[in-house]
Amino acid sequence: MEKGFKKWSKDDSKVLSRFLSEYADLPIVAHCAEYDYEKVLLKAFKDVETLEWLPPVERWRCTQILAKSKLKLPKYGLDEVLEGCGLEAREPGKPHEAEKDAECAANVYLHLNTLPDLKESELGFWNQ
């Protein structure tokens, strides 16, 4: 177990599930949502046998995937996307902070949804 992290419990699954149920009409937004879903939450819920409480994958929105349809950037990490959106980036050299990353992803999501999709001709070689 990493320093500073407590072991995920059945109670943690219950609390998160209740919270997400209260806001069931809202998406769950993350940058690299597939990683957060599969490597973090799916594993945590599975480890304590509460998989049925995990929110469905259809609720998730990935700001990295969304950014690729809206912005032409050399890289699509959270810092690059924040910069591409003209939003305040995370402080360089600071350790990863999940709460700050979640706030940044939410701001990116809201901003990207105001932008039109790139035209196919703007997508670059990877779409050909």
Where are these regions (language model features)?
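Metal-dependent phosphoesterase core characteristic of DEDDh/y 3'-5' exonuclease domains
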Residues: M1-K3, L20-Q128
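Metal-dependent phosphoesterase signature
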Residues: M1-F19
